[in-house]
């Protein structure tokens, strides 16, 4: 649910994008004077801040046996659950040891289950990608660190927030749906 207090808080931190920021950036990049709202959130480019969005979703989980028994359309499997919540601060979260642990463990899980070749040649990374300058720097650093450590030369990275905005509580669901297609 989009609440006014969320807008006020993000704006107070300077994390929200604004028409003025968009207009200034478009002028700097020579993108014309008419505001192009499709470029409002730029997670990996010239960052202006996040856009609040709204979504919801659900996933039905079942064992392999049950899925085959009922003829379910199997879209993926859960290898492991690696999570880190660092939003307990009164400022924009920066990467801590938990962030590195979660991402590193995920790389290890993919390599262990699917092998080195799949990890290096057939993987993609759906980033949190809020569109704030701090997120771009910290998230890019974490992903680059592990890609290098695991010998990955090219790792496609994307974020759905450039199209959906930051949907807060359901942002992880958006990313899951993006991964499953």
Model regions and ranges:
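Glycine- and aromatic-enriched membrane alpha-helices
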Residues: 136-154
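Buried hydrophobic packing segments
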Residues: 60-63, 106, 143, 173-180
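Surface-exposed alpha-helical interface segments used for non-catalytic interactions
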Residues: 99-101, 141, 174
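An N-terminal domain-start capping segment
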Residues: 98, 121-140
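Acyl-CoA/ACP chain-elongation machinery
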Residues: 1-51, 81-95, 129-136, 153-181
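Glycine-rich, phosphate-binding/catalytic loops in enzymes
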Residues: 10-13, 76-77, 141-144
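Alpha-helix capping/termination and helix-coil
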Residues: 107-114, 129, 133, 147-151, ...
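Condensing-enzyme catalytic core mediating Claisen C-C bond formation in acyl metabolism
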Residues: 22-118, 123-124
């Amino acid at each position: 649910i989009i609440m006014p207090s969320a807008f006020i808080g993000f704006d107070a931190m300077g994390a929200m994008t604004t028409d003025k920021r968009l207009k200034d950036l478009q002028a700097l990049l020579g993108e014309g004077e008419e505001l192009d709202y499709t470029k409002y959130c730029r997670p990996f480019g010239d960052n202006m801040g996040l856009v609040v969005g709204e979504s919801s979703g659900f996933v039905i989980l079942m064992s392999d046996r049950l899925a085959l028994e009922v003829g379910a359309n199997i879209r993926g499997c859960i290898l492991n659950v690696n999570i880190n919540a660092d939003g307990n601060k009164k400022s924009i979260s920066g990467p801590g040891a938990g962030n590195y642990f979660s991402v590193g463990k995920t790389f290890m899980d993919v390599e262990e289950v699917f092998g080195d070749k799949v990890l290096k040649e057939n993987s993609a990374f759906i980033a949190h990608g809020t569109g704030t300058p701090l997120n771009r720097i910290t998230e890019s650093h974490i992903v680059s660190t592990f890609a290098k450590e695991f010998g990955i030369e090219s790792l496609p990275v994307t974020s759905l927030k450039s199209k959906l905005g930051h949907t807060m509580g359901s942002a992880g669901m958006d990313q899951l749906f993006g991964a499953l297609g």
